[in-house]
Amino acid sequence: MSLEVIFGSNILLILVAYFIGSINFSIIVSKIFKKSDIREKGSKNAGATNMARNFGFKIGFLVFFLDVSKSFWFAIISAILRDFVPFFGAVITQLVVLFVIIGHVFPIYFKFKGGKGAATNLGMIASLNIILAIIGGIIFFAMIFRWKIVSLGSFITPFILVIFMIIPWMNSSIIAYVGYSDFYQPVRESFQGAWYLSSLFLFLAALIILFTHIPNIKKLIKKEESVLKFSKKSKKLA
């Protein structure tokens, strides 16, 4: 396989990933169903937590589900293309899915002002190993139960999961399909499946999420960060 094909296939999917990631469901849902821009309310963040705080748990969960889905399904589709379409045989799935997160944080459709990437990162994690996603959920909710601060769990949990991903079973088991065959055959044989790739790109994703939470970290230091509190009013989509 030529270098042109290797770079071309990865760049093509990176661009597609970025444009898909740029579809910010918080902004779209708030404008369509609530006739307002979520970026002008509450924390002004275009994410599921701010949606839940301002419009209720149900609509917040809808956005959360959609954000998780866009990275999860893009990872699955890109892995299928990698394994069954020769042109995409050298695609690094974890790399291209990282750009779904980047698109979510810096959406081209919304003046590069998007969400913080936590839910989209969860979709990437779930695609790599659903058990890892469950572990992440347990850690996240344990932190929420203890401190009732969503941002704290959002930027700490990804770094903890990077450590878990180093465990061989997490990145090379039968349910770790997306990360199992990272490169085309000659490279897979030389690097034994490039086991480190999933951990590497999860770490990069964690750094992005840490960056987006810098304002929250400053508030935490000043003890001004918001505690978990959803709207008690009954909210409907229409």
Curated annotation (Swiss-Prot):
Enzyme class: transferase
Reaction catalyzed: an acyl phosphate + sn-glycerol 3-phosphate = a 1-acyl-sn-glycero-3-phosphate + phosphate
Pathway(s) of this molecule: Lipid metabolism; phospholipid metabolism
Any one Gene Ontology BP term: phospholipid biosynthetic process
EC number: 2.3.1.275
Signal peptide (residue range): none
Functional description taken from the UniProt entry: Catalyzes the transfer of an acyl group from acyl-phosphate (acyl-PO(4)) to glycerol-3-phosphate (G3P) to form lysophosphatidic acid (LPA). This enzyme utilizes acyl-phosphate as fatty acyl donor, but not acyl-CoA or acyl-ACP.
Name of the protein this chain belongs to: Glycerol-3-phosphate acyltransferase
Gene name as annotated: plsY
